[in-house]
C-alpha cells in the first residue's frame, strides 16, 4: 500500500484535522501522529484535555491498522493517563501487536517532546472484509 495514498486517506479525518492533529508517519502496522499544543487544547486545570490525547492516539491506531489496505474500525479502546502536559508537541506512536485478518490489536504510546510517557492507549479493531481504505491506481 502506498504511503502517500494512506496519508491522503487520513486527511479526510475532519475531527483530527480540526484539532490540529497530523499523521506524520505510516508503515505496515505502525503509525506516528503529532499535535502542537495550543490554548484550545487545555482543560480548566491548564493541562491538555484527555480527549485530545485520546483522539491523537486513536488516529495513530487507525492509521496503523488500516495500513494493510482493508478498512478497519475501532471496536474497543482504553486509555490510561499517567502524566499531564500543557505545552510543546505531543506524539503518539502506534504499533500493531496482533495483525489478525478480522480483529487487530494495537498499543499506542503517547509522549511529550521530552520523551515523557503521558498515556498508554490500547485498542482492538474490526476489519471490514471487502471494503478497502484506499483504492490503488493501477495505471
Regions found by a protein language model. Give the residues of each.
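Terminal targeting signals and extreme-terminal segments of soluble enzymes
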Residues: 1-139
